[in-house]
Amino acid sequence: MYKDKVLTEIVQNTELGSIIFDNTIFEEVSQELFSPSSWLHSKKSSNEIGGRGNVYFLNDGDKKYVLKHYFRGGLVSKFSYDSYLWLGENKTRSFREWRLLKFLYDKNLPVPRPAAANYQKNNYLYKADIITQQIPEVQPLATFIAEKTIPNNFWCKLGYQIANFHFVGLFHADLNAFNIQIDKSHKSWLIDFDKGSIRE
């Protein structure tokens, strides 16, 4: 998971908003970074990893990333499917999730390393994206338990891992069998921290 360098936080203004990024991953950033077509390889994900069809796998020939565009759910999506009310930079969905991931990553918890996030503002609304490093060779818990023989200690280890997140005060707004990912060594990872928070 590319833990060779300390995660940094840089904020750079753009024409319509800002980008927050780790400059040990991306030395230079622009809005083009969040366009799948600007990458050497990009592939839209299947729905099995969760989300609303808003995730792309990106590959620059060296490292692999995941790009998520923020979409609304529920009834409100009928009126505004990817725009959110502007309440300030620090309250954007993308910046909040990026910083929450950084907090968890810095505590050596099993989460994807945040690479970059952005927002683009238009009057009282904004749109947003986030890029994280891809966790190698994982599958959703839902798929794992349907296809694999479950090791005897698997559920205990999973419970212990989730407890570690609670010990640091994490509230995950959508913890389900798709946002828990299992790698080849049966280690569990948590993803999708949109609307998550740290609570005392």
What do the PLM-derived regions correspond to, one by one?
Residues 125-127, 159, 173-175:
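Short gly/pro-enriched beta-turn/loop segments at secondary-structure junctions
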Residues 140-148:
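AlphaC helix of the protein kinase catalytic domain
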Residues 167-177:
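Catalytic-loop of the protein kinase fold
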